[in-house]
Amino acid sequence: LRFDSKQWSGRVDSISRSLLQWYRNQGRDLPWRNSQDPYCIWVSEIMLQQTQVERVKEYFHNFLLRFPTVFELAKAEEAVVLKYWEGLGYYRRARQLHLAAKKIVSDYDGKFPQDVRALQQLPGIGRYTAGAIASIAFDLPEPILEANSRRVLARLIHFDSPLSGGKSEQPLWDVAASLVPRDGGAGAFNQALMDLGSLICRPVSPFCNECSLVDHCQAYQLGNVDRIPYMPKQKSTQKLEEKAYVLVHEGKLLVVRRQPGEWWEGLWDFPRTIPENMAVRGPQRHQGVISYSVTHHKITCQVLSKMISQRPAVRRHQRWL
């Protein structure tokens, strides 16, 4: 399916006006919208990747208090950045945020590039995030496409092909590019599109009778709102079992640093196997069971404790607490 821009050329102004009027009255009041500082916008967008808005609200303010500028973030130790990210999950985002801050300082003297291609060269910044920064911070007419706006646009043009990322979404990028205002207000338009998707054009039971774009929505007119967008089936949940060892010596507990390629790389955790440099003694005690999820994995972890007969010299990735 290709998007025919000529078909929509006469509707662009009407769609933009209707959406922006709704946004002025009904848009969400979010803390990162009180600024056009590209640093604040960038931090919020990275936090919002795969994390609910309400959760991000809890962390955004404290993160900016600790790292108020890109310079402060760039010079911080990675461990400190990860500590302030703790609880948001997907820690790779924090590492890439830190790396990008260093690059912005070293390559751009701390000033964010305004070109989307240059923005996409920074760690952790893809097409959507680059468009969000460019449009919201610099009011450049750059389109965005994320979960909420994708749903609005798919219903708007009755896009019934499977959405699996990449080239499959190009028609929706074309729609977004055709609609974003060229003469100012691009940031407000993009945020309005996201808010409409979050508040009105919901995945299930959307409030079509309250939607400012209902007169233009082909999915609504064809009675297919509930089945668009068409999303491929998600991966089935995989069940995993593991053991975590609480190794004790004279009141101290051993923790190990997660290695590259492991979940939570760089974070400290109880070992999942008994390290070969540890000599254990006495019985093994069962302390309980913890269940948690990582991506599409559901994990059951047995927590076991053992005493260490003597405390050996720790290796670089080990620590007694």
Locate the predicted segments by residue.
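Intrinsically disordered, low-complexity, charged terminal extensions of DNA damage-control enzymes
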Residues: 1-28, 34, 198-321
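Catalytic cores of DNA base-excision repair glycosylases
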Residues: 2-4, 8-11, 17-209, 213-226
